Structure formats: structure tokens, C-alpha cells
């Protein structure tokens, strides 16, 4: 390997080294640059243009200065290797290694002969020649080791330079964001100024890299729709409660960890999208948003829903809670009588409350991918009379509830990746109608069996009662007869005798 790193393997390092000043005078022998016939280096100008196109910040003086100081060890080693010469080829190294082994073996035998014959000068000349050859072989091996270490050094240096560039690129991006933030702030100020003099019903500030929402936004009268999605908001000001007319609020894809308690004062809010944030809980006050029709809290870190979410969100039709860590639904969920669409896949649900079956308007239900946590469904699951689509895939359900056959509206069913025993696999493969028929017949058979068992028990009880009554009457009759006979029969004189 030549002292100059190949631009193909070390593009950034080659670019930086090519811009280092050279203080060493070129010897006549080094007037022609080394040329590797197997791996000729590409044109320096073309490689420089290519790397600068890919990494434009390389042309910045401060970036280049940082990189130059980071590879001082490479520059020093390169200077030494220029003096030592190119790396010996593989064959030369193998020959030197074999020759060195041969020389060491010869010298060892020679020393033994000297010890035995005590003839110190016998092979002196030969040993001197061998010592010279040994030195030459060792120098070849040492040069190969230095070049190997240099190659490792080049790899480490390239990685260092890439890290420096990435850091510079990140800083540049942050600077650009700061500039953009100033521009956004000017846009926000413009919106607020316009809204103070003119009625505004819609504001769209999505994708503006906003980090902060001014308190003054809460004073925009008549605002119906506010879109703040795809920003970098970490909080929403309490002043948002001043948007009394707000119907739709979208704060999805931000960095929100909490929602303000004042959100419960948005009594006219119908659509709330807080998906793809960092929420671990919802404020209890959200239950007071009684006009909500759609609530999307998917792709967060929720572990539960507010206890009283059901009684007050009576108009909610669509609830999206997928990709959270919810372990159970509150009992009050059964009071969401308007709910039609519920998506809760990819959570940690371990079951459904018995009140869940009160959601008689529910049409779509996705409980898939709760994995090892979800093992069964409520017995009265069949009371969800409006259910049309049901996804239970990727759970641990062994048996569908016995009332499943009464889901007359069900047209789509997915129970893949469950250890189902009831219904059996062959029935599931035939489709949703086959499953409903099987479960319906199974339910009828179970009811008939229960009725038969009940009748048998009643008959046993009736028979037992008749026998008891008969025995009682017989005992009474025997007692009466005994009493009658005892009072009217003459006494036996023999029995009356004194002993």
C-alpha cells in the first residue's frame, strides 16, 4: 500500500491530506509519483469535486481546520513512510519470513557446534552473512507491520473525519433551524396581527418547526380550525382555552409530553388529534370535551385512559388509541353509546371490561397485536349487535365466547396468529359465516345440554320429595297404629307377675 490513501477507500481523508502544505523537499527518485497498476488512484480533481458535491460543508474553513488538526498523526506517519518506501508485496513478506526462520535455525545449530568443538572462528564469515540477511528480512517484516498499522490508522482517521463532518452538519442544520424559527416567528406575529383586526376561522402552521406557541393565540376570536401538526412543540399554553369556538385541533407529530388541563374548556371541540407525541396520560379534564366526535391519541406512551372518559364523551364516534401501552379500558367505556370505531391494536390489553358489551353501536373493532396479554373476550361479547369488522389477530385467544354466533352484522373477521381451539382451524378457514354458524350451533347444543341437566336435576328433586313425603306418611301411620294397639289390647298376666 502506498503512503497516499486511496480516495476510493478514504475519500474524506484524501481530500483533507491533499490540502495540507508540504514542507519536505522531493528527492530525484520521488519526482514521479508512485503508480499502483492494480489500483490506480483516480484523478484528484474529479474525486475532490465528487466528495464536495456529497459533503458541501468540506469547503468551510472552520470545518477543514478541525479536520486538519484531527489527522496530525496520519500526516506524521505518512511523512515517515515516504522515507521508508512502499509496502513490500505479499510474496516478499512470505519469502522474508521463511528466510528468517531458516537463518535462525542455522544460527542455532552453529552455536551448538561451537559449544561442542570449541572452534569459535570456524563459521564466523558465514554467520556474519546470515546476520546481515536476518537484518534485511526483519526490516522487510517491520516495514510491512508499519504499513499495516498505517492502514488501520487511516481507517480510524476516516471515521474521525466523518464524525467531525456530521457534527458540523448538525450544527449547520441547527443554525438553519434558528433562521427558520425567526422567519416562522415573523409569520406567527403576522397571523396574530391580522387576526386582531380581521376575523379568522382557520390557521395552518403545520410543518413550520415551531417550538413555542405564543399565549396570544388564545385570543383569536372565532377560530374554528387550528393545525399545528409536524412541529417541535413541547407544550400547549393554557390560553388555548380562550378559543371558545374551536371545532378542530390538530397537534399531531410534535414532542408533547402533556396536555393542559384547560383543554377541557373547549366545549365545542369535535375533532382532537394528538397522535405521534410523547404523552403518558391524558388530563381528566378531557372528559369535559362533551362535543368530541373523533379523538386520536395513537402513537403515544399512554398506559391508561381517564376513569370517567365514558359518561361525558357521549358523542364520541371514533376513538383511536393504537400503538400505546394501555393495559385495560376503564369500566366507563361502556357508556360511550355513540362509539362506532375503536382501534386499540398494538397495546398491552389483558382483557375487556364486562361493560364493553354495552357499546351496541360499535361497528369496527381492532384489538390485534396485544400479543401475550389478550387471552379472552367477555362472555356477552355477542351483544355487540352492530359490529361489522373485528380484528383479533396476533393475540393468545384460545376460544371465542359462546355468544359469538349472535353477531349477525359481522362480515369481516381476522383471528390469525392465535392458538384457537374453539372454533377449530378448519372452520376458521371457511370464513366468518362458518365461524358464526359453528359458534351458534355450539351455543344451542350447550343450552340444550344445560336444559337437559336442569330437567334431570328437577326430576331427581321431585322423586326425592315424593319418597320423603311417602316415608313420612308411612311413619305417621305406623305410629298411629302402634298407639291404638297399645291402648286397647289386654294386659298379659304373666307379664304382670313380680319377679
Swiss-Prot record:
Gene3D superfamilies found in the cross-reference section: Ribonuclease Inhibitor
Tissue: Widely expressed.
UniProt keyword annotation of Iron-sulfur present: no
InterPro entries: Leu-rich_rpt, Leu-rich_rpt_typical-subtyp, LRR_dom_sf, LRR_domain-containing
Pfam families: LRR_1 (PF00560), LRR_8 (PF13855)
Coiled coil: 138-187
Traits of the deletion mutant: No visible phenotype. Pirl1 and pirl9 double mutant is lethal due to a male-specific transmission failure leading to a severe pollen malformation.
Keyword annotations of the record: Coiled coil, Leucine-rich repeat, Repeat
Matching SMART domains: LRR_BAC, LRR_TYP
Gene Ontology CC: one annotated term: cytosol
Residue numbers spanned by region Disordered: 25-48
LRR repeats: 197-219, 220-243, 245-266, 267-289, 291-312, 313-336, 338-359, 360-383, 384-406, 408-430
Motif mapping: GVYW: 431-438
One Gene Ontology term from the biological process aspect of the record: pollen development
Function as written in the Swiss-Prot or TrEMBL entry: Leucine-rich repeat protein that likely mediates protein interactions, possibly in the context of signal transduction. PIRL9 acts redundantly with PIRL1 in the differentiation of microspores into pollen.
Annotated family: Belongs to the SHOC2 family.
Name recorded for this polypeptide: Plant intracellular Ras-group-related LRR protein 9
Gene behind the chain: PIRL9
Amino acid at each position: 500500500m502506498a503512503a497516499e490513501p486511496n480516495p476510493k477507500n478514504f475519500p474524506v481523508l484524501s481530500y483533507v491530506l491533499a490540502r495540507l502544505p508540504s514542507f519536505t523537499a522531493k528527492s530525484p527518485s520521488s519526482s514521479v509519483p508512485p503508480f499502483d497498476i492494480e489500483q490506480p488512484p483516480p484523478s484528484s480533481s474529479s474525486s475532490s469535486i465528487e466528495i464536495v458535491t456529497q459533503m458541501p460543508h468540506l469547503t468551510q474553513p472552520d470545518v477543514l481546520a478541525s479536520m486538519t488538526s484531527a489527522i496530525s498523526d496520519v500526516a506524521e506517519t505518512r511523512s515517515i513512510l515516504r522515507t521508508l518506501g512502499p509496502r513490500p508485496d505479499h510474496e516478499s513478506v512470505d519469502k522474508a519470513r521463511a528466510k528468517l526462520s531458516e537463518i535462525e535455525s542455522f544460527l542455532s545449530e552453529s552455536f551448538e557446534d561451537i559449544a561442542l568443538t570449541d572452534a569459535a572462528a570456524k563459521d564466523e564469515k558465514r554467520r556474519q552473512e546470515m546476520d546481515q540477511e536476518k537484518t534485511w528480512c526483519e526490516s522487510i517484516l517491520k516495514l510491512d507491520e508499519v504499513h499495516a498499522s498505517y492502514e488501520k490508522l487511516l481507517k480510524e482517521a476516516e471515521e474521525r473525519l466523518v464524525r467531525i463532518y456530521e457534527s458540523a452538519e448538525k450544527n449547520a442544520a441547527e443554525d438553519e433551524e434558528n433562521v427558520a424559527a425567526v422567519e416562522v416567528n415573523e409569520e406567527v406575529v403576522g397571523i396574530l396581527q391580522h387576526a386582531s383586526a380581521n376575523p379568522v376561522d382557520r390557521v395552518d402552521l403545520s410543518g413550520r418547526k415551531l417550538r413555542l406557541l405564543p399565549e396570544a393565540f388564545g385570543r383569536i376570536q372565532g377560530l374554528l380550525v387550528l393545525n399545528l401538526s409536524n412541529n417541535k412543540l413541547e407544550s400547549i399554553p393554557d390560553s388555548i382555552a380562550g378559543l371558545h369556538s374551536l371545532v378542530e385541533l390538530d397537534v399531531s407529530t410534535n414532542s408533547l409530553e402533556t396536555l393542559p388541563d384547560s383543554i377541557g374548556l373547549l366545549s365545542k371541540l369535535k375533532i382532537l388529534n394528538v397522535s405521534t407525541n410523547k404523552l403518558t396520560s391524558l388530563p381528566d379534564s378531557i372528559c369535559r370535551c362533551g362535543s368530541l366526535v373523533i379523538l386520536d391519541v395513537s402513537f403515544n406512551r399512554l398506559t391508561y385512559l381517564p376513569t370517567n372518559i365514558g359518561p361525558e364523551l357521549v358523542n364520541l364516534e371514533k376513538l383511536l388509541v393504537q400503538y400505546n401501552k394501555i393495559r385495560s379500558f376503564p369500566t366507563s367505556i361502556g357508556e360511550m353509546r355513540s362509539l362506532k370505531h375503536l382501534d386499540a391494536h398494538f397495546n398491552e390489553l389483558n382483557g375487556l371490561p364486562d361493560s364493553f358489551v354495552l357499546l351496541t353501536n360499535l361497528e369496527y373493532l381492532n384489538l390485534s397485536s396485544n400479543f401475550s396479554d389478550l387471552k379472552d373476550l367477555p362472555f356477552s361479547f355477542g351483544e355487540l349487535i352492530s359490529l361489522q369488522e373485528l380484528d383479533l389477530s396476533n393475540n393468545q385467544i384460545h376460544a371465542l365466547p359462546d355468544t359469538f354466533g349472535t353477531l349477525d352484522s359481522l362480515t369481516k373477521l381476522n383471528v390469525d396468529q392465535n392458538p384457537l381451539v374453539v372454533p377449530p382451524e378448519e372452520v376458521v378457514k371457511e370464513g366468518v359465516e362458518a365461524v358464526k354458524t359453528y359458534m351458534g350451533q355450539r351455543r344451542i347444543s350447550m343450552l340444550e345440554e344445560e336444559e337437559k341437566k336442569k330437567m334431570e336435576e328437577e326430576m331427581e328433586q321431585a322423586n326425592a320429595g315424593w319418597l320423603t313425603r311417602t316415608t313420612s306418611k308411612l311413619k305417621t301411620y305406623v305410629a298411629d297404629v302402634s298407639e291404638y294397639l297399645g291402648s286397647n289390647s289386654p294386659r298379659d298376666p304373666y307379664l304382670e307377675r313380680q319377679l
